[in-house]
Swiss-Prot record:
It is found in: Secreted. The modification Isoleucine amide is found at I20. Its main location: secreted. Belongs to the bombinin family. Expressed by the skin glands. The lineage of its organism: Eukaryota, Metazoa, Chordata, Craniata, Vertebrata. It comes from Bombina variegata (Yellow-bellied toad). The keyword Transferase does not apply. Keywords: Amidation, Amphibian defense peptide, Antibiotic, Antimicrobial, Cytolysis, D-amino acid, Hemolysis, Secreted. The modification D-allo-isoleucine is found at I2. This is Bombinin-H4. GO terms for biological process: defense response to bacterium; killing of cells of another organism. One of its GO terms (cellular component) is extracellular region. Has antimicrobial and hemolytic activities.
Amino acid sequence: LIGPVLGLVGSALGGLLKKIG
């Protein structure tokens, strides 16, 4: 259960960083 959640969080975080950067 934690694996998929971490994947979603990582994907969202990556998108945010790309937006800010």
